[in-house]
């Protein structure tokens, strides 16, 4: 039974844990924070998480995927950092817009307040006004949730690297939080690189020492260090680092590279990071309940079968652009005790029949994920054609649904079928701009934060494949799009092609799901939504699970 507090029993302070990074970026702070959160939940605590992003963008919604990676959409429609996807998957809970704080959001709020006269004529400065706004957003994560439950622990990851000029207001705010709520209610974890020099055969501790010195110079004394390395850090080196960085030996944790990100909680558990933190913060706890996670790790490390899943996309040079899609595919594989090997396929390589045959010939299943713009679109449509003709299981997501509809429309005699996104003057726009998106598309309104975002309900056709996969006919999925199936062409496409419009918005206006009759194709399903955002490693999403099951069934048939 959870020891979480409610608003009627609020005697114990919410504890705040801050995770910072040093030496280099991309150390895995987000995964470390999420893994610690999972561990604390396994000990019966209520945990929520937050990402503090130093960039000046209000959110990543308008950022190039090559710049930022995936944009993760929350239930309430916030476009956030991809680390929130890790948080949701590891904690198995939905987060909100409040879980992602950017410099852009903070400055926008402070400047708007100044314009309204909220500072009563005072000079607005980084300290205290910007830091106060950051602190308010951090402390607000400790408020009761919609069920009246107050979290036991809030874990806040500070993006960037200690020493970055952009991170300074966030680190100063974190320092002030510790001062305000009491040191007994606050815990700092610093992730640092311990590089291995092959020429000398040594692990070097000096970068970590310098990084901690930089952190201490701004008033933050780390309580624990997570040492990132490509191998185990010996106890002697951990003792040396503890001495030189003035950290308890029990608080120096080795976290080497691992085959699967889902083994990180187990690594931190064996290093006793959770027990050290619980002891320091005087948290109530129980023995770790590993039941669900151990079953997951057994499936991760002991697959019984293997399939290859191709992802046909525009941004495949940066796999992080499709991070949640990859994790959803892997989770579906775990559910079926199957290793899923991911093959990255550039959509431009599939434009011709010969190119599609070369690029797609060795895959057992295909996923066509979301994206924007005309580049590579004909390759995605050609990939749909190849999958349809060769009966390869295919799942289309967002833009993937639109490609499936365009391909079916061309089968139905609409040879010029396309989307107004790719050709605003299209003669046969089977995909068109949503009415409420016209202003943004025409440049008369902001692009950022104006798409159809967040969770929306859909009604599935009784007896359809998607209804069978979900097990229900009323579902809810997250969205991020401006374009929709043009209802003027629905009847013609439905009558002249095997495509079935198997799910719509409750009012029947928006097409949300399409599929092919199973007599025509074993598994060709697409959704306007982004179901990958709701997948969990311990609970595969039904659509991805269905894709993997179809690929396994096809492999048995072929054998």
Curated annotation (Swiss-Prot):
* Classification via SUPFAM superfamilies: Class I glutamine amidotransferase-like, P-loop containing nucleoside triphosphate hydrolases
Region feature Amidoligase domain, mapped onto this chain:
1-283
* Record-level GO cellular component terms: cytosol
Q: Which CDD domains match?
A: CTPS_N, GATase1_CTP_Synthase
One matching Pfam family is: CTP_synth_N
**Keyword Nucleus carried by entry:** no
**Which reactions is this enzyme annotated as catalysing?**
UTP + L-glutamine + ATP + H2O = CTP + L-glutamate + ADP + phosphate + 2 H(+); L-glutamine + H2O = L-glutamate + NH4(+); UTP + NH4(+) + ATP = CTP + ADP + phosphate + 2 H(+)
Pathway(s): Pyrimidine metabolism; CTP biosynthesis via de novo pathway; CTP from UDP: step 2/2
- Which top-level enzyme class is recorded in the Swiss-Prot or TrEMBL entry? ligase
Q: Does the UniProt entry include the keyword Iron?
A: no
Name the residues annotated as catalytic in the UniProt entry: 398, 530, 532
Question: InterPro entries this protein is in?
Answer: Class_I_gatase-like, CTP_synthase, CTP_synthase_N, GATASE, GATase1_CTP_Synthase, P-loop_NTPase
Q: Which UniProt keywords apply?
A: ATP-binding, Glutamine amidotransferase, Ligase, Magnesium, Metal-binding, Nucleotide-binding, Pyrimidine biosynthesis
Q: Which GO terms describe its molecular function?
A: ATP binding; CTP synthase activity; glutaminase activity; identical protein binding; metal ion binding
| Residues given in the record as Mg(2+) binding sites | 83, 157
Q: Which residues cross the membrane?
A: none
User: Could you give a single Gene Ontology term from the biological process aspect?
Assistant: 'de novo' CTP biosynthetic process
UniProt domain Glutamine amidotransferase type-1: residue ranges: 308-557
Activity control, as annotated, is: Allosterically activated by GTP, when glutamine is the substrate; GTP has no effect on the reaction when ammonia is the substrate. The allosteric effector GTP functions by stabilizing the protein conformation that binds the tetrahedral intermediate(s) formed during glutamine hydrolysis. Inhibited by the product CTP, via allosteric rather than competitive inhibition.
Record HAMAP family: PyrG
What's the further remark here?
CTPSs have evolved a hybrid strategy for distinguishing between UTP and CTP. The overlapping regions of the product feedback inhibitory and substrate sites recognize a common feature in both compounds, the triphosphate moiety. To differentiate isosteric substrate and product pyrimidine rings, an additional pocket far from the expected kinase/ligase catalytic site, specifically recognizes the cytosine and ribose portions of the product inhibitor.
Question: What's this chain's function?
Answer: Catalyzes the ATP-dependent amination of UTP to CTP with either L-glutamine or ammonia as the source of nitrogen. Regulates intracellular CTP levels through interactions with the four ribonucleotide triphosphates.
Give the UniProt family note.
Answer: Belongs to the CTP synthase family.
The name under which this protein is listed is CTP synthase
Organism phylogeny? Bacteria, Bacillati, Actinomycetota, Actinomycetes, Mycobacteriales
Its gene name is pyrG
